[in-house]
């Protein structure tokens, strides 16, 4: 089926996103120039330019030039806060050849700008970016010139940029993890954890945090390629190869679309279809089949088999554009149905119920661009060897890098994907909703080809917060009710509509826990639960043996890190639980007291700091064992356990 006009809703989404999917180019006639060298940065208002790292952040650039101390050491967090209040500029020069400028099209592609950025090319304003979570594709052929070209990006302070919204809002949102008296984080589509959390450093940075490229094309380009699984049996996989193709030329274009498929080095199988591309965006659907498909399996069940798919656009016997994906053939359902005990909540993979064993994942570093490919590989090796099969990407961080989802595919790890909203109500004015729509469009399209992606979740704990965290007492009734109306617009209307439009085969829940139970016994039989009776409620570890949910999507207990880690941020003279340095790395206001309270129940409190740290780690392990074993013992009533949390973003 060929749709030469395209659906209005899809076109609207593309215009909102201004987005291009991150993809691998190979064996085609396009040319990709990576702009990751020659960058300089400067504090706005000064003329001191220094070499910059791209992708990168202004904090890391300042650290590299010894203009900031190591933010993770001692109490240095206090010494870096001035950066968030300043504007910063980045610039580079690159060369365009006469041959490149003869191409039919040139696109400047930013995969990530953090966050408020004005982009200039040769002095012309191309873009005013305002969302960290989307990529931007800008046609630039008319702005380019033969020889040297100048690219300049002006980053506005995310603090000063959002102060006018705060001042006109009339109240301070209850975003208490934002470590500032004015809670500005909710106004920006920017990683919430960067403003601080009850385990995290505050480092509100700016920068070009994902790759920048210029792409030159002739005739046509592929802006999206979705391999949609229609039906799967042991005998046959029926697929639809859905492409969004841009005919760059001002006239109809005769072309051939070729779909290539191979498996583990086997001979490539191809199907082709002749098409006429109208000028502009064309939507093309080409059916294909895989006989005797080898299914993608989760970790512990078998091999996570992946097929290689590529789509090529051929004009006059020349491949002018190509996109490729690795595709896992499988079925995944989130079974959420009424039963004799309440409401089930479990993953069914390839028709078989699966007990979820895993954890909640937060960003691996306070400075995201410091996470190397090697760190991603180590993370997933550890996840696999720990016999996990599910990771929840928590909603206070970021939509992860492509490498994360590729490794999840390769290691058989299902991904529970939150949208990036956590622990506070958010605005719902038209401008904010438009940004969120662009964000949802971009990331659903970017991630939907991954076999590992199991589900979408609207937010972390926001409905629970609205119901149980005292907002009804702390805000006037009209504001409190507006928070609920805003919740409905975001999480019951906008986001599920985008999932249905762009990724209809995946399950969406509006929040986790979706019943908003806050550990109440009457709701343990319904859906997923966050049980913080242990820790905040000071209930015993033994209570986890009996406080049983259908699916435990969060529970946990804090400890200090190992002494090896403590030695990276504290000197021996700081080795006291309540020292200034240790308190700076304890972000929970009740953390030290609760660790001591629980320790007193089962152990003699050690006097020596190193012993206290060690016993605290044992204590944490003891508590987690109670929960993990209880959840596994009680299946199929309980069908999953995800502890909080898998990792840290700094030494804390």
Please tell me what each predicted stretch does:
Residues 1-7, 11-390, 630-634, 638:
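Secreted/periplasmic carbohydrate-active enzymes, especially glycoside hydrolases
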Residues 31-34, 40-48, 53, 193, ...:
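Substrate-binding clefts and catalytic carboxylate motifs of secreted carbohydrate-active enzymes
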Residues 115-117, 160-161, 204, 335, ...:
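Flexible loop/turn segments at secondary-structure boundaries
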Residues 339-345, 401-403, 438-446:
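Alpha-helical scaffolding within the catalytic cores
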Residues 357-359, 391-393, 415-417, 551-553, ...:
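Hydrophobic faces of well-ordered beta-strands that scaffold small-molecule active sites
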Residues 410, 427-519:
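Active-site neighborhood of glycoside hydrolase catalytic domains
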